[in-house]
Amino acid sequence: MVKGKRGMAIVIALIVLTCHLLFSAQTVHAEDSEGTQIAATLFVLKNASEVSNAKIHWAPVNGANEYELYRSENNEPFILLQTLTGTTMDDYDLTIGSTYRYQVKAYGGSSLITSAVSPEYAPHTLPDNLTTFDNTNQSTLNLPNELKVGDTYYRFNFVPKSSGGFGQMIQQTSTDDSTYGNDKVVLSYTDHPDLANSKFEGINVLYHAPTNKFVFWAHYENSTDYTLARVSVASATPGENFTFHKSFRPEGNESRDISIFKDDDDSAYLISTANNNSDTILYKLTSDWLDVENQVSVIYQDQHRELPKVIKKDGVYYLFSSQAAGWYPSIPMYSSASSIDGEWSELRTIGNTSTFSAQSGSVMRVKPNTGNQVIMVAYRWMFGWAGTENGTTEERLLPVTFSNGYAFYDYFDQVLYSANDDVVVPVQDGKLLSQGKPATAQTATGTNPANYANDGNYQTEWIGTGSSWPHWWKVDLGSVQEIHNVQISWWMQKGSEGFYKYKIETSTDNVNWTEALDRTNNTSYGFTSDTLSSPARYVRIQMESAKLHNNPSNWYTPRLWEVKVFGADEE
């Protein structure tokens, strides 16, 4: 844990959100690292009324240099859509009333290495009365409160002392999960010696039905530093005061970032980072959830992962985590297992290399417990959104898809959802025009050419030669298009993170250029999504400079992970 960022989030957010982290379950076996799986996310184009497009992802395969993507409609034979080097593709204008499956074949040279078939997907009309979560503006995710006992909903706020550290835990109640009141102090810093000079982070509150108790778990520290590395546990009968039981190190191990996972059989587990976040350890709780029964396994050793979150989907356990990087956007990864006390897969990449200018956060069902739609709520700390003056959201909502032990997510500016109806529909501002199109750059190394920045793979990159700035990268869309949105995944060095000052320039003839957007005021790390309106065949990213947070000199080499240009054919 670094500098209290989790605690800050907990103070300003209701405990209701953390309650969504406690997932119910449903047994499929995870694939090994030489296999692959494929899944799709259905999405709607901006201002359209049909959810008739699919963003398809598949896992990269060791030794593969080419993939063939196929589609089957209504269980007819698969037909080849495209041969490509990336690991994603969009498929547009699907038919309402039909069902679709996708197949990917991975080749090393002319040899087939492996293949996989996706689940079935059914395009549909856009439902009414969906709520919009805007990933580019201040947004609040509103999901049902799971802490309901009888006819009463409960939620908890945490108020610090004026001198800092934990002050009070305030209970609020509601009969409709809308209007909350009846504020009551249910835990105070005066209630136990361990609370006098303390702070909580990573707070989890669960309802344990067999004992009719709320159970509270949190990362526990003193109010001034991070030297204790303990967990803490408290409990209460709903409506009554909490009893603080103890703070301790589970099995004698450090404990920093934590979460609690509840399985189908009402067993519960503590997932905890230890040894300054270098290890991730899984513990089983006692049947009353008030103590650690035993250590189950060390899932990761020397991997430096933070904020571990587990969800069970279609019988498979998935563990999502963020790279330890302080306040800065970092690399998201996940592992999967067919049994929670069994062997976990290797860490796998997901999304882009900066969690789209955020950190891997809470993964949850939109409809608690019984829902099928899953989202990643990625956290944007201080340097993720660079202050609230630019109005960007403090969280990013990323729809997650799963297939036999593999997980995928991507970025959309807007996500529509309904918890009651278990609906998640991302919105894309135009078709992806740039993937696989001819790309050039001011310079490029022989092993990282310009087309690596628009190949449909977030894990490959274009790299320029030397460190001369400004520097440009350009794509030829093939014909004049109306440009709506440009998304850029920027390279960063862990420990010396920097953001880029840049301009987006457009041309219809590759001779006369227009400055379509000046982003030399950018302060977002790792990822940007820009809205613009410009007819163009050529789109050029003019990188003016990079500003490193810990060095006044820009020693970066110009490079880009991925550039995505969205829009529509100009008529």
Labelled PLM ranges:
Residues 2-5, 12-17, 408-410, 414-455, ...:
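Juxtadomain low-complexity/linker regions and immediately adjacent membrane-anchoring helices
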Residues 20-35:
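Sec-dependent signal peptide cleavage junction
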Residues 32-63, 96, 111-125:
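Pro/Thr/Ser/Gly-rich low-complexity, intrinsically disordered linker/stalk tracts
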Residues 56-59, 79, 116-202, 206-256, ...:
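Beta-rich carbohydrate-recognition and catalytic domains
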Residues 59, 455-515, 521-571:
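Aromatic, loop-rich ligand-recognition surfaces of beta-strand-rich domains
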Residues 63-80, 506:
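Extracellular low-complexity, O-glycosylation-prone stalks/linkers
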Residues 80-86, 517-521:
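Short beta-strand segments within Ig-like beta-sandwich modules, predominantly Fibronectin type-III
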Residues 91-111:
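Beta-strand-rich modules
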